Every structure is written in C-alpha cells, then in structure tokens.
C-alpha cells in the first residue's frame, strides 16, 4: 500500500477562503472561539467547535454538539461556500510567518503504515481527546483537521514542491495572527505521479502535531473495517529543515515546601546558577532560565549529568529528572494540577507575569526541542514527555478536508 495518495479535497470555493479558514480547534477555548467568530458566519470554527452555536452552558462533548457540526458543514456545502474537487489532487500548502516559509504536501497518508510505525509518533494521547475527534469524524463523515507531519532530508522532494508551487496560488490568505496561508492545487497527472513516487520511497515520516487526530482516524478505520477512504488520514508533510519548534515552558504553583533560598541550594547540586539582570533566553539545549521571587537566573547543567540517549538528552527530560520530579514531587505532568505549560510565543514576560501575579511560584524557560531530536526519539520508538514541542505557525482548519466516501 502507498504511504500517501492524492484525494478529492472539500475546500473553500474560489474567493471564499478568507471567510472560512480558522485557527485549529485545539488552540482556542469555547469562549475564545465564540468571540473569534463574531461577524464570521462561515468560519470553520462553526464545524470544528460547534458548541459556539449552542447554549454556552452545554457540555462540549454533548451529542447535540456533534450533530451541529454536521448541520453546519452541510449548510456550507449547500450554500456553495465549500466545494469538493472533481478528481484526486495533491495540494501544496505554504505557511509564511515572521519572514520564514515552510512548504509541504497536503495529501492523505496510510493508516496501515501508521500502524506499522512507518508513520512515527512521539507523543501519548488521552482518551477524552481521542474520543472527541472520533465523534467529530463520524458526525461529519470527514477528517477536518490536517495532521502536521515531517520528512527527513530529501532534496528530490524539496525540488518537486518548489516546482509544484511555481505559479499563482489558488488560495492566498493572511490570517488575523499574521500567518500567510497559500495553496496550490496539483491536478497534473505527471506531477502527481512524480510526487507519489518520491514520497512513497521515504522510509518514514514523522508526526509533528496532531497525534489525537491521527489516533482518532485510526480508530474510525478500525471500526469501519475493510479498505476505503477511511484507511487514510488527512496530512500535510513538510521538510524537517523548514519546521519551527518554539520553546514550551513550565510554571509551578508552589515550591513543594521550600523557600526560594532552599530551592536554590538544591539546584546548585546539579546546575551552575547565575543571577541575571535580564530575562534568560536559553542559548543551548542544557541551559535554562528560571524566574523565582522576582528575579531571573540562568541554570546550566553540570558536566557529566546529561545522558547520551535520544530521550535522556532532551532539555525537558533533563529538567524533569533533575528538577520537576525530585524537587517538586511531580510524577505525571499530564494530571498534576501544580504544573502548567506556556508556549514560547508568549515570551519570558509571559512566564514572569504568571509568577508575579501570585498564581505561580516559579517558572522555567527551556531551549526548544529540535526536529532532529524529535525524529531520533520517534526512531527509537520512545515517547517524549508531555508538552515537549510547540510548533508555529500552525495549519488552518478548513483549508482542505478529507471526505470519507
């Protein structure tokens, strides 16, 4: 079976993308989504977060919510806002943000290869989030949020993507957050064949963002059985060298019974600790910023304390094993209410604000996980700690959708 193949995307009608494209469903709360769609009747949030069209008190996992998603999608198709391509195509999807671009292939990827670990994972999923995506797929009979994937060094593929994006884009929209989204439809059979051959020769691709969506697609395929469109999941695959991972930082509610001075005394056993007059932006993998009692510190792990294996040398693994677990007693960051996570887009001021408000007691700034490290962990069939990666920019919901025939 092929690793990827073209598909007939359901997507905004010509000239309608600016009305439709929305942030991914999981980056906005229901309240934020309600605010976002004011004056935007065709925003894809009406499908990806349909509770915004119901009583604010409703449980977002109520059956009525998923029924509303199906109703809203049918209305968008009936009104001609969304149309489906007549023949299977590939789509070149380019994201441009802060002067950098990444260009990938929108396609559908094999769930058989996902099961065989040719499509590699690095993150655990939670049943509640998986269940939500399963119910969403079943309700609308489509996969409506692409999984962001990556491939390792492949110059032939890079050249093909550039070739396919050589003309005027079919979609060119700049979103409210400043991210430019461009799409080129690839309908030429010869170019489709070249892209298929090149991608299908890859030994592996790597899930970057979208583990719950891919896991949900796999569950739907298992339930439906047999072969069909449900045997593939909606994907956009980018070259590893173009991917941008921001830091994903930690804030903790208390010092686990210690005073600030006592915490510093514990930290010097594993780190050199240097006060800083400025916010600390870690410059290397095992350098950390810490904001404690109104002051920034630079922490650098002492020589010989970093393991050599792909998992052990991750910045978050070192912090977890040397600080979060032994000093704060946090064994499962996914469930412990004393820890929270802040994406790097908020910057060091966002960390300091959480501490200065009194809500949190200490903040740790981390060096971003690198794509090479992510791939090495996935190749070793290991699972990274929760909230290890924050990818920016993110794919828009609504650009391409995979209908399950």
Predicted regions span which residues?
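Surface-exposed, charge/polar-rich loops and edge strands
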Residues: 1-405
């Amino acid at each position: 079976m092929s690793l990827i193949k073209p598909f007939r995307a359901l997507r905004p009608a010509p000239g309608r993308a600016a009305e439709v494209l929305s942030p991914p469903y999981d980056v906005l709360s229901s309240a934020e989504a309600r605010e976002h769609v004011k004056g935007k009747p065709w925003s894809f949030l009406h499908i990806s977060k349909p509770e915004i069209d119901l009583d604010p008190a409703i449980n977002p996992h109520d059956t009525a919510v998923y029924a509303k998603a199906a109703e809203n999608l049918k209305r968008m198709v009936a009104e001609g806002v969304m149309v489906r391509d007549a023949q299977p195509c590939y789509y070149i999807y380019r994201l441009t943000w802060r002067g950098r671009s990444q260009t990938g292939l929108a396609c559908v990827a094999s769930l058989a290869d996902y099961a065989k670990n040719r499509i590699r994972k690095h993150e655990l999923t939670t049943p509640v989030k998986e269940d939500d995506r399963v119910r969403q797929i079943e309700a609308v009979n489509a996969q409506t949020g692409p999984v962001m994937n990556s491939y390792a060094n492949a110059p032939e593929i890079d050249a093909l993507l550039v070739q396919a994006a050589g003309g005027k884009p079919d979609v060119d929209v700049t979103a409210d957050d400043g991210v430019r989204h461009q799409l080129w439809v690839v309908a030429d059979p010869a170019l489709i064949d070249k892209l298929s051959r090149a991608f299908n020769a890859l030994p592996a691709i790597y899930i970057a963002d979208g583990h719950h969506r891919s896991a949900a697609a796999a569950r739907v395929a298992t339930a439906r059985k047999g072969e069909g469109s449900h045997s593939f999941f909606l994907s956009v695959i980018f070259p590893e060298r173009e991917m941008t991972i921001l830091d994903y930082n930690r804030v903790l509610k208390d010092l686990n019974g210690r005073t600030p001075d006592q915490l510093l005394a514990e930290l010097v056993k594993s780190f050199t600790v240097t006060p800083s007059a400025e916010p600390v932006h870690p410059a290397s993998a095992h350098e950390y910023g810490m904001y404690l009692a109104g002051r920034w510190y630079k922490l650098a792990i002492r020589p010989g304390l970093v393991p050599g294996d792909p998992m052990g040398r991750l910045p978050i693994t070192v912090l977890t094993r040397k600080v979060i677990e032994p000093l704060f007693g946090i064994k499962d960051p996914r469930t412990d209410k004393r820890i929270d996570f802040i994406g790097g887009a908020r910057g060091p001021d966002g960390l300091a604000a959480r501490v200065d408000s009194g809500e949190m007691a200490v903040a740790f700034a981390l060096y971003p996980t690198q794509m090479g490290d992510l791939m090495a962990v996935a190749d070793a069939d290991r699972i990274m700690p929760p909230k290890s990666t924050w990818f920016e920019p993110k794919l828009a919901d609504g650009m391409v959708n995979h209908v399950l025939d």
